[in-house]
């Protein structure tokens, strides 16, 4: 009896269609259509069309078409779009068809230069299409896509492997490109305007407000920190960020840069992408109170000021634009000696003291007269 049951089970197994996914270790899911996705990072609106190709490497000849994906100049930030892969309506044979899928270009093409760059995806995928005889007709029974290289062209194990090919946000059949333009270069990064020559991507200047009564040291160095949050797909090295004070230029490699400025000095940053969020902080300094005038993307001047002496001044959460970006810091000086009396108020203190002394002398004089 047991032998009969086993034989029946084997017969049913042979009669059922074999899942082509079984070779991949998954017999529960089959996919019969595929979607490719494209992510475009840009802080500057660009009309761009990206193209892809599926090169056949195994199986009878059967061409697969991957549609272009287009972004408009209003698609800024990080945007993702998907397109459905087109397979032949008729297949020559049953079996496995293997394709290598890559990105082939962008239209219009952008030439990488000193102030702009299009970072193209180097990702590569293997797409295996399984065709079976279903109802006396050859049709797709399963599609499996594996990533073999990531967007940087690397084959790291944690960034490769089988990917989702559905028409959902889980889709991993993805190519990511980034367009980056240097801040401050204007609308034509190939030919930056005169403001860029003067201010670069961002200019931070320093001065001390002085008058005849002040004894401020104009050779004193004030400490600053500039923090950067770079747009998606970029970092300090993408356009070679640098900081220049006078004849000294330093490369920036991280997300923070410290520097010192004296009265009348400035630091000019270059190589910072449009869309970089900045925070500029002047450290608290005894006897000094800070204020700043801020212009971002050549917009309206904004004032930032501290209300007390010896407090840090921070200009925060500003996003660099294509046009002029400046932070002009001014310090007001008031000397506070160990007595705690501010020198600018000393004359008033002396006047009060003299009045008090005169009052005491008058009272003493009156007492002596009364005693007589």
Residue ranges of each PLM-predicted region?
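Solvent-exposed loop/turn and edge beta-strand elements of beta-rich ligand-binding domains
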Residues: 1-372
């Amino acid at each position: 009896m047991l032998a009969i049951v086993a034989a029946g089970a084997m017969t049913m197994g042979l009669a059922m269609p074999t899942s082509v996914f079984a070779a991949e270790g998954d017999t529960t899911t089959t996919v019969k259509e595929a979607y490719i996705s494209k992510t475009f990072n840009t802080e500057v609106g660009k009309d761009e069309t990206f193209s892809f190709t599926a090169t056949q490497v195994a199986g009878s000849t059967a061409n697969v078409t991957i549609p272009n994906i287009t972004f408009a100049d209003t698609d800024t930030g990080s945007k993702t779009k998907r397109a459905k892969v087109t397979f032949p309506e008729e297949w020559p044979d049953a079996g496995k068809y293997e394709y290598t899928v890559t990105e082939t270009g962008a239209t219009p093409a952008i030439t990488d230069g000193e102030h702009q760059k299009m970072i193209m995806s180097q990702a590569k995928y293997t797409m295996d299409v399984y065709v079976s005889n279903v109802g006396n007709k050859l049709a797709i029974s399963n599609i499996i896509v594996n990533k073999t290289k990531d967007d940087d062209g690397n084959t790291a194990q944690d960034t490769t492997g089988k990917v989702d090919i559905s028409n959902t946000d889980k889709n991993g059949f993805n190519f990511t490109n980034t367009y980056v333009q240097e801040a401050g270069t204007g609308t034509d990064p190939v030919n930056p305007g005169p403001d860029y020559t003067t201010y670069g991507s961002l200019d931070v200047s320093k001065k001390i407000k002085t008058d005849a009564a002040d004894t401020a040291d104009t050779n004193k160095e004030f400490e600053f920190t500039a923090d950067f949050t770079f747009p998606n797909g970029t970092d300090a090295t993408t356009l070679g960020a640098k900081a220049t004070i006078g004849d000294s230029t330093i490369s920036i490699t991280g997300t923070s840069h410290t520097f010192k400025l004296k009265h009348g000095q400035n630091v000019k940053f270059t190589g910072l992408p449009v869309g970089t969020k900045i925070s500029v902080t002047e450290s608290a300094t005894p006897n000094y109170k800070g204020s700043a005038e801020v212009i971002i993307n050549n917009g309206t001047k904004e004032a930032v000021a501290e209300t007390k002496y010896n407090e840090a001044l921070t200009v925060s959460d500003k996003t660099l634009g294509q046009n002029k970006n400046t932070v002009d810091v001014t310090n007001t000086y008031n000397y506070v000696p160990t007595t705690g009396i501010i020198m600018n108020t000393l004359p008033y203190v002396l006047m009060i003291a003299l009045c008090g002394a005169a009052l005491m002398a008058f009272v003493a004089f009156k007492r002596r007269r009364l005693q007589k």
